[in-house]
């Protein structure tokens, strides 16, 4: 796949997005380092390990390998879907997965009973503050000044309608935040832009593998 991207588009990936393997080995980090990757993002790590690393602000680290180290970002919560990416409360974050507005597919509505709604001039202040509260809480788990908030899930962005819902509503909040919370810089971004900024952070060095995997008590995969 890497060679195909290079031969077809002249692009060589520099950052890895690995959100769904059930655990992560040190060999994975070594192979990516040998291939020239600058950083990697991982998600499925034992929930108790995540908790311990979050308490120490060690969810970003330099993963040590026999061939060098690679900057690694570990997502902090249960899953990589919309309800589990903006902050610690999925019942709130789900309200900002705007693909759930109106008719949809399997992701219609939120299982916590609080639905996503369109952002308007009448609710933008309240909605933005509620979203930012979650973002601030997530930021406390990391040492750096940059916060990564992925927007999506499995099988997403298959229609222009969904993309419009997501980007239009987030842009309305971003516009409000830029005016009313000028101390923050907020924008749509890419994984590479995030890593280029986050790598400036002084992070710990860790080694070893993240096995076995469990996402909740006694549920081992």
Regions found by a protein language model. Give the residues of each.
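Catalytic-domain carbohydrate-binding cleft regions of carbohydrate-active enzymes
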Residues: 1-221
